[in-house]
C-alpha cells in the first residue's frame, strides 16, 4: 500500500499541474486579453501583453504534457480495479493530447500576425486584426473537439474510482456525471447558437470541476486508504 500511496501522490501532483496550468491557459489569459466582439481591442491587448500571451501558450504545453503522463500513473494505481476500464481510461485521455498540442499552433500563428515581419506590411490593419481573432476562434473550435475526450475519459476513470474501495465513491460519481456534462456541452455547442452564453453550460460543468479538483486534492493530500471510503 506504501507503493500505492506514492503512486497516488505522483498522480495528484500531475493532476494539480494540469488544473493550475489549465486554469491559467484556458481561463485567466483569455479573460485578460480576448474581447470576442472587438478584433481591434483584442489585437492591441495581445500586442501590449505579448509576454502574458506567450506564457499562456507555455502553460498550455505544460498542461497537455502533464495530462499525457497522468493517465499512465493512474493506470498503475487503478489497474487492480478493472484492467479493461483502466486501458479505456488511458486511451481516451491520451487521444486528446495531440489534438490539444496541434491546436496550439493557432495561438502561435497569432504571434506571427502581431510580429513585425516585412511581409505583414502588405496586409491592412483591419484585416490583420480580423485574422488574429479568426485564429483564436479556430483555437476555440479545436478545444471543442478536444473537450469531447476530456469528457469521455472521465467515465472509466470515475467508475474505477467508484469501485476502487480506496478512493471516495462520491468523487467517482462526480467524475462520471462530469463525463455526461462534457458531452452535453459538446453537443450543445454545435447545435445551439450562443450555447456558451447560456447559464446551463456552466452548471453542467460543475460535476466535472468538483470531481477533478476533488480527486486531485485527495490523491495529493491523502493518497489511498486501506478500507473503502464513502
Pin down the residues of each PLM region.
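Hydrophobic, aromatic-enriched alpha-helical segments typical of multi-pass transmembrane helices
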Residues: 1-230
Amino acid at each position: 500500500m506504501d507503493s500505492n500511496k506514492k503512486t497516488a501522490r505522483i498522480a495528484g501532483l500531475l493532476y494539480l499541474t494540469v488544473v493550475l496550468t489549465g486554469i491559467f491557459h484556458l481561463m485567466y489569459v483569455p479573460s485578460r486579453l480576448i474581447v470576442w466582439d472587438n478584433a481591434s481591442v483584442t489585437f492591441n491587448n495581445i500586442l501590449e501583453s505579448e509576454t502574458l500571451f506567450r506564457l499562456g501558450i507555455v502553460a498550455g504545453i505544460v498542461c497537455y504534457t502533464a495530462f499525457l503522463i497522468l493517465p499512465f500513473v493512474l493506470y498503475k494505481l487503478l489497474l487492480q480495479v478493472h484492467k479493461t476500464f483502466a486501458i479505456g481510461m488511458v486511451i481516451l485521455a491520451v487521444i486528446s493530447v495531440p489534438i490539444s498540442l496541434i491546436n496550439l499552433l493557432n495561438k502561435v500563428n497569432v504571434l506571427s500576425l502581431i510580429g513585425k515581419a516585412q511581409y505583414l506590411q502588405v496586409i491592412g490593419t483591419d484585416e490583420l486584426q480580423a485574422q488574429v481573432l479568426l485564429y483564436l476562434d479556430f483555437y476555440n473550435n479545436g478545444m471543442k473537439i478536444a473537450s469531447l475526450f476530456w469528457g469521455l475519459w472521465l467515465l472509466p476513470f470515475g467508475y474505477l474510482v467508484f469501485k476502487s474501495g480506496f478512493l471516495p465513491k462520491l468523487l467517482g460519481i462526480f467524475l462520471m456525471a462530469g463525463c455526461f456534462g462534457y458531452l452535453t456541452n459538446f453537443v450543445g455547442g454545435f447545435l445551439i447558437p450562443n450555447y456558451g452564453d447560456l447559464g446551463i453550460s456552466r452548471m453542467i460543468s460543475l460535476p466535472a470541476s468538483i470531481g477533478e479538483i476533488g480527486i486531485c486534492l485527495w490523491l495529493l493530500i491523502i493518497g489511498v486508504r486501506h478500507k473503502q471510503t464513502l
